[in-house]
């Protein structure tokens, strides 16, 4: 976190035009995306794209040579640029040699990456962006806010003002009239242009063909009307065959704009001819006299050599991750990004630009995993963000406060207990009668302006369950209860309810005394050493009594126990084997209750309406979605589905502490959706989500209750 980023976040959140634009457009994108994916097997198609990209990057040296050979045979001049400066110099030199005065440019994120337009303009060459969105941000003097929707952050009123000024006409806000005016203004630029510049969505090695996808036709004109066409292409865009390209097309436009297929697909194989029919060259079909392809490295080969970050090269730049990202929905890509936006942008920025810029961008990630779920190449962006933070922590060191918090306190459970006990006494002047903290002093008040906080318990769960530190010798299923820090110290009564319900369900639950923090705060901040130490502590504590299963009430903890411990112990085979055995025993509370009572019948209606919030780490982290609903319905509750039930509540990552104003923005959307259901109670099987939702609803003076399903069931027994 930096003061500069905090200011940028605040500016975005208080920009009425930006907030209006994001609300309008992202809602529309979500709607059309649902339509476009209806009846489509996203799982199998995304697995196919993943395979194609894995194979392409693995075989990239050979594919590059094949592409260069085939493109050269087709009459293309291929130049390999080491970095941005090398690429820019080549294009500028070519333009100067051809006495180019006017250039039309089709959309290219690589062009943005290397700042090609700015480089050419400094040399006195006029460059016009021809993608409508890119043209709008060019007129505004800004950078794109989205990988495929550059002007998504602009309202229609702002767009009308920009186009009116550019064309000298007084235009209203009718979209078609604005498009017509833009087309008229841009049409002459194609005719006047001496050079066209494009990127490429795909480069096909077997024929040396570039594939350019657009929705406006500007790509066709920019690559055919001028006498010289220059394409700047990242090496990662190269695939083996036309078949591979076709597979990518199946999802590309659905993910970008909710369209089943792109409006225009240009296949470019050399100058003055086209490959409209694969394998059948049509000569004399018009087009440029010269085609130059600039293959750009700029850090890509280095990225390919890293096991931790190679999969960032699988990105097809569709923007699906941005369309579902709660942080992007609040501040857009000019805050949550450098050149490339979002979580994937943070990874790309680390290699293509600067680790300092990447660190700033990564600090905004909530870790909700919505991006991973939406990605057509199945890229694990959250995991790469975690690796980036670990790499930065190793390279630059952790801030002093983090080192103390993680290495000196969190790592040692007795110390953490003492600190919490001290805190439970120091908090007293700020605790209201209902055990809520609504105002903290000094800088900490930024947090209580967002949510009301629960008071720390004077009797943490460890003290309350001293008599349950080991299971009794019975034939009942032995269930180890892993509570997590928030339940243990802020909501111990929920832990007691868990024990009560599990006993009623015929289990023998116990609370292993040796359990410690799962290590998530340290792990996701990059402190791998502390996280590994805590992993070993918990593995030893939880496996000691040989439980049949391990129940959790915090999905974040469950995901760490189930998945991250495998990663943390990967270099130590014996510990990794123990972690793997542990992972197979992890159960969410609702899962376990259904397993323990499979034959329980449905109870009569309680005439109580509830809605359910899907915690990010429960649904996307460990794959539990239907079980909580099944349990609630079986117990006689009427479940009213809220809109975007699986959208993040804003608690995740370090955002709630580092950027409370951003967390509040994400939370607002969730609370609005909860209230819209008319439910009396919102249920969620995540303790941190309970903290966030209760705190947010309290600030609204709402009468809606927030409960864990264990609390609800305990009251019915």
Please tell me what each predicted stretch does.
Residues 320-347, 364, 370-391, 560-562, ...:
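Iron-sulfur cluster-binding cysteine motifs and their immediate structural context
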Residues 77, 81-82, 255-266, 322, ...:
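Flexible, glycine/charged-enriched surface loops at secondary-structure junctions
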Residues 228, 264, 288-291, 310, ...:
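Active-site lining segments that contact anionic ligands and/or coordinate catalytic metals
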Residues 40-42, 90-97, 107-194, 201-204, ...:
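Iron-sulfur cluster-binding electron-transfer modules in prokaryotic oxidoreductases
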Residues 1-307:
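The feature marks the mature, well-folded catalytic cores of soluble enzymes
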Residues 295-318, 345-368, 662, 672:
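Ferredoxin-like iron-sulfur electron-transfer modules
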Residues 230, 307-313, 346-358, 369-376, ...:
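Short beta-alpha connecting loops at secondary-structure transitions
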């Amino acid at each position: 976190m930096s003061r500069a980023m905090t200011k940028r976040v605040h500016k975005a959140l208080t920009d009425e035009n930006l907030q209006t634009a994001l609300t309008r457009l992202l809602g529309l994108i979500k709607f059309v995306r649902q339509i476009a994916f209806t009846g489509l097997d996203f799982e199998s198609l995304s697995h196919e794209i993943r395979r194609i990209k894995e194979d392409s990057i693995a075989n990239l040296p050979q594919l590059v040579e094949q592409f260069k050979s085939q493109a050269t045979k087709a009459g293309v001049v291929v130049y390999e640029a080491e970095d941005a400066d090398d690429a820019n110099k080549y294009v500028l030199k070519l333009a100067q040699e051809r006495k180019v005065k006017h250039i039309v440019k089709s959309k290219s994120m690589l062009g943005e990456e290397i700042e090609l337009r700015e480089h050419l303009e400094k040399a006195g060459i006029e460059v016009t962006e021809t993608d409508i969105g890119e043209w709008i941000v060019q007129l505004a003097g800004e950078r794109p806010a989205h990988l495929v929707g550059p002007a998504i952050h602009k309202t229609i009123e702002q767009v009308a003002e920009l186009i009116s000024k550019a064309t000298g006409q007084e235009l209203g806000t009718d979209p078609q009239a604005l498009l017509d005016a833009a087309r008229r203004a841009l049409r002459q630029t194609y005719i006047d242009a001496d050079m066209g510049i494009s990127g490429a969505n795909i480069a096909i090695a077997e024929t040396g063909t570039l594939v350019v996808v657009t929705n406006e036709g500007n790509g066709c004109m920019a690559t055919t009307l001028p006498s010289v066409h220059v394409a700047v292409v990242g090496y990662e865009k190269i695939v083996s065959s036309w078949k591979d390209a076709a597979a990518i097309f199946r999802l590309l436009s659905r993910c970008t704009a909710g369209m089943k297929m792109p409006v225009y697909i240009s296949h470019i194989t050399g100058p003055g001819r086209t490959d409209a029919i694969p394998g059948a060259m049509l000569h004399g079909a018009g087009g440029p006299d010269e085609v130059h392809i600039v293959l750009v490295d700029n850090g890509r080969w280095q990225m390919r050599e890293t096991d931790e970050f190679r999969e960032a090269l699988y990105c097809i730049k569709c923007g699906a991750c941005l369309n579902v990202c709660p942080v992007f929905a609040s501040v857009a890509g000019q805050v949550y990004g450098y050149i490339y936006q979002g979580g994937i942008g943070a990874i790309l920025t680390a290699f293509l630009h600067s680790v300092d810029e990447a660190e700033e961008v990564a600090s905004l990630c909530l870790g909700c995993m919505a991006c991973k779920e939406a990605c057509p190449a199945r890229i694990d962006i959250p995991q790469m963000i975690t690796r980036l933070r670990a790499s930065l922590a190793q390279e630059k060191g952790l801030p002093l406060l983090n080192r103390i918090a993680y290495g000196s306190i969190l790592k040692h459970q007795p110390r953490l207990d003492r600190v919490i006990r001290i805190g439970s006494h120091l908090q007293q002047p700020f605790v209201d009668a209902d055990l809520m903290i609504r105002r903290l002093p000094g800088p900490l008040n930024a947090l209580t302006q967002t949510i009301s906080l629960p008071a720390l318990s004077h009797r943490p769960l460890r003290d309350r369950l001293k008599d349950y530190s080991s299971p009794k010798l019975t034939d009942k299923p032995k269930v180890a209860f892993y509570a997590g820090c928030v339940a243990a110290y802020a909501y111990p009564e929920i832990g007691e309810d868990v024990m009560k319900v599990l006993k009623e369900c015929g289990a023998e639950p116990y609370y292993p005394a040796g359990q410690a923090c799962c290590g998530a705060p340290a792990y996701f901040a990059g402190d791998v050493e502390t996280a590994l130490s805590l992993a070993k502590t918990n593995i030893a504590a939880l496996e000691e009594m040989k439980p049949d299963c391990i129940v959790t009430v915090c999905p974040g903890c469950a995901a760490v126990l189930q998945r991250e411990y495998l990663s943390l112990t990967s270099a130590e085979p014996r510990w990794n084997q123990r972690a793997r055995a542990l992972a197979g025993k992890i159960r969410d509370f609702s899962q376990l209750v259904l397993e323990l009572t499979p034959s329980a019948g449905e109870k009569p209606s309680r005439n109580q309406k509830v809605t359910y919030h899907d915690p990010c780490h429960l649904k996307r982290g460990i794959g539990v979605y239907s079980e909580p609903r099944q349990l609630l319905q079986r117990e006689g509750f009427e479940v009213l589905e809220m809109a975007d039930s699986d959208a993040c509540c804003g608690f995740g990552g370090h955002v709630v502490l580092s950027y409370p104003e951003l967390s509040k923005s994400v939370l607002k959307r969730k609370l609005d959706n909860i209230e819209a259901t008319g439910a009396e109670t919102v249920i969620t099987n995540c303790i941190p989500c309970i903290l966030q939702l209760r705190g947010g609803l309290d600030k609204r003076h709402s009468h809606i209750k927030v409960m864990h399903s264990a609390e609800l069931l305990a009251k019915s027994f």
